[in-house]
Amino acid sequence: MPFGLKLRRTRRYNVLSKNCFVTRIRLLDSNVIECTLSVESTGQECLEAVAQRLELRETHYFGLWFLSKSQQARWVELEKPLKKHLDKFANEPLLFFGVMFYVPNVSRLQQEATRYQYYLQVKKDVLEGRLRCSLEQVIRLAGLAVQADFGDYNQFDSQEFLREYVLFPMDLAMEEAALEELTQKVAQEHKAHSGILPAEAELMYINEVERLDGFGQEIFPVKDSHGNSVHLGIFFMGIFVRNRVGRQAVIYRWNDIGSVTHSKAAILLELIDKEETALFHTDDIENAKYISRLFTTRHKFYKQNKICTEQSNSPPPIRRQPTWSRSSLPRQQPYILPPMHVQCSEHYSETHTSQDSIFPGNEEALYCRSHNSLDLNYLNGTVTNGSVCSVHSVNSLSCSQSFIQASPVSSNLSIPGSDIMRADYIPSHRHSTIIVPSYRPTPDYETVMRQMKRGLMHADSQSRSLRNLNIINTHAYNQPEELVYSQPEMRERHPYTVPYAHQGCYGHKLVSPSDQMNPQNCAMPIKPGASSISHTVSTPELANMQLQGAQHYSTAHMLKNYLFRPPPPYPRPRPATSTPDLASHRHKYVSGSSPDLVTRKVQLSVKTFQEDSSPVVHQSLQEVSEPLTATKHHGGGGGTVNKRHSLEVMNSMVRGMEAMTLKSLNIPMARRNTLREQGPSEETGGHEVHGLPQYHHKKTFSDATMLIHSSESEEEEETLEAAPQVPVLREKVEYSAQLQAALARIPNRPPPEYPGPRKSVSNGALRQDQGTPLPAMARCRVLRHGPSKALSVSRAEQLAVNGASLGPSISEPDLTSVKERVKKEPVKERPVSEMFSLEDSIIEREMMIRNLEKQKMTGPQAQKRPLMLAALNGLSVARVSGREDGHHDATRVPIDERLRALKKKLEDGMVFTEYEQIPNKKANGVFSTATLPENAERSRIREVVPYEENRVELIPTKENNTGYINASHIKVVVGGSEWHYIATQGPLPHTCHDFWQMVWEQGVNVIAMVTAEEEGGRTKSHRYWPKLGSKHSSATYGKFKVTTKFRTDSGCYATTGLKVKHLLSGQERTVWHLQYTDWPHHGCPEDVQGFLSYLEEIQSVRRHTNSVLEGIRTRHPPIVVHCSAGVGRTGVVILSELMIYCLEHNEKVEVPTMLRFLREQRMFMIQTIAQYKFVYQVLVQFLQNSRLI
């Protein structure tokens, strides 16, 4: 041969060497094994060989992966020949064994060996830095790992071996001294876990890792259909998409995905419910093929094994059931009740103890969670908004139930109690969108009484979670000294030294779950004879009774003893402190949308009953229904009124009463006491009549008249007693069992509207149809001394008179359903119940009477109309006489003087001069964090940034290592009351997760948005909450999932209920979103009264949320106010509310001084002279409304 090559001539063919190959597999404990396979062997065969060596039976959770030629981790296709696959794609024939399919709960893993390998995998994920965790979590995990790997600390003479053991993630670069300090902390953590078995420590380690961000996720860089670079990820719940800065934009659940395919370099996600396809682009075709194949494999696995694929309109919380005992842990753990005696229909086999868990859950496991409620609940069963935690995991499901019942708390804010109590009710997230907020509807007595008539369930088969459903055990009654006031405020004025005192320090302390669930905060015994909270609900109010031996029962105590204990009686009477139901159905806007919001927490506790709570309902309805028979009018002789009068007779009496009252306007009206009488009333003479006070508020305890207790008499008679100068309405009656049965059929319907222009009513004023303000209440002076008993108007008479025009605010679909139900009901069932819903013909007749009397009134008679309206609405004012009154009269500035001063400034142009003299920002302001280059894109307008000393600081994250958000703390003290706001810009598309992080960390419950999403064709604020009616009505922003529960449009503003869930901890919170939508693109709103109604809605919701949080937090959380840049309209809202507070409480009104003070906390507050002038217009309108009171 010319080249000197030698050919072998043995002619032997090595068959064995051609048909077999050896591959190496690195295990999770870093050991490497070799496996001899044939060239035709698949990856599945190799995996089974590895599992045989590890004694694994549950191999379907694991897989094999390799490093590609581009050093990317790639999973082996188990069904294809392994050698061919590795030769084509792998960098070297080295495989890695690992967990391919993560699970949301380690309890799914049945085998001990499986759990051990799973533990090795999650520990490897932590140590390699694939999961983000804080130093505290690193120490805790390291301590558990040492306990799992080495056992108890006392087996070693010292902890020196820890220096050679890998304890911390690879990316945790630290100095030697800091590393030594961390090692010592790990040694202490290891010592604290002494006595825990290694297997238990492994499970505890896994449980801790499951809460970390990024657990079980694989992420691939792709581009969306718009060409934006995003991360396409996959985990056990589905497929998610987030942008490069980390904000999670959307999650596609496994049940929503039809298929995953690829077309060249594009990946297509075909959705089932929507006729659309999500499209993503990769770098090359092979990448797209691999990702689509991987996603298809995961999709098939999780759907076949029914993991995170339950039917739900929103991603459910991950519920974990620990399979080990935590009794040896040194840290306090949330109290978890074991699943005992759970009986459920075969539709669902999972029991949720979450208060919002009314949707079917997983079909294969029984999970229990104690703190996944919409509102915070205590360990002893008391919840902060006046309810008792419904612990469904213990005896709370009967065999007849086919769905998970909700707690009496309005956790699902959009589902009324009447629907939940129906046996055929199927929860639907999508159909709950038209329901009004939880603080507006009233208890459905018809349903409650109907169930009560069917009889009580046996004690052993009842749900014990609601047996201690008593008003005394709610949070409202845990603090009986608190008063809830309506607008205008009537509370005592606090002494003050400085008009606007600035809070210098801004401490940001996060509320830990242990703080939120501290049972000591709610274990407040109720003393006999303590003051009660006043009831103010839309239907006849829940009357109080004398407190007799009240005892504080907790849910945990009741569950422990399995005893039925009836609730204690209601506390002793107290005057109402809110004006109930002055809001008619809205057409354009309602000024003061919900006056009865402030005490709605009391109503919520009797709103959504289970069958075993009927004794409470029975006791309440006995008191509620008494005034229904107490209708009288002045001018007729004493007669007997049968309690089973028809509707027409009672309505004629009502109209007669009103007509006689109108005719007697020339007679001065005496005082009406607002306190209910404890015993038989005795009429004495000497009603001294006093004139009306000046146009300013007297600080009294009540603006509404409460119910009157009936006597114990068996007589069904009503005696008419007339005072010389006053139309008297009195009653001394008891009703029979027949009437109670009739009351049980009362349909709790809101009254229909007038067929003409709708009236809009505020807490402070009623407006005529023409738009001119009408007085809503008049104040009569009441004597403290004197033996005479007071006169009172019952609530039934108020409802009869006001029923046509003054009803609860409901949504239009609800009104339609009410009308349909009216048509279906037979005429013979109309007595008494129709008091709550007058028919159209009666409404027309009453309108005619009102119009005729209105035309007759002239001169001095017209001036007395405010007093008449107050009387017809059952309103009176008890002004306490004495030295205190003299002091207030001497110091109070009449409303007319303040009104003239404000108008004079507007007319003389002094407002412009004031505004020009106020500096735009603080002279020596520091903006060090805001001006950092990495934070420049986080501000909408780079010239508008927060001061360093009072900026809102977020907990730093990997994406936001400075914790920056363009938001400022605004703290003002006026008259001894501290006001705390957070003024911020509207979130940008890439800062929505920062916004929700701020809301969560600052404990915010109310968000006031003073802009539309788009104005004049320009985007004013990115939408940072999900639209109602969209798929799932929920969206995920970083670590937070936001779900829209309801939306109520009130003309110039919209009220939205949101549920915010922290994905890592599973905790949830209710957030009210109030959006003002009538601000024009240029200028200011023309409808000043509408803007006032928006401010009143903010006040109402604030009072509601603060009352819910009483006892949990020492200070009320701030309100987030934002517009586009967070300075112009935001400043208008804050300044207007503060100045209105000054007017209400007779504080000195200095608008320019307050604005200067606000600008020292956030620059450019109120950007234009038009906005500054608008604040004055709001104050003028407020005073004009107040003049009529």
Swiss-Prot record:
The positions flagged as active site in the entry are 1123 (phosphocysteine intermediate)
Q: Polar residues bias: where?
A: 760-771
Could you state what the record's PTM comment says about this protein?
A: Ubiquitinated by the ECS (Elongin BC-CUL2/5-SOCS-box protein)/LRR1 E3 ligase complex and subsequently targeted to proteasomal degradation.
Tell me which UniProt keywords the record has, alphabetically: Cytoplasm, Cytoskeleton, Hydrolase, Nucleus, Phosphoprotein, Protein phosphatase, Transcription, Transcription regulation, Ubl conjugation
Subunit structure, as described in the record: Interacts with FLT4; the interaction is enhanced by stimulation with VEGFC. Interacts (via PPxY motifs) with YAP1 (via WW domains); this interaction leads to the cytoplasmic sequestration of YAP1 and inhibits its transcriptional coactivator activity.
Write out the similarity annotation: Belongs to the protein-tyrosine phosphatase family. Non-receptor class subfamily.
- For this entry, the protein name equals Tyrosine-protein phosphatase non-receptor type 14
Q: Which gene encodes it?
A: Ptpn14
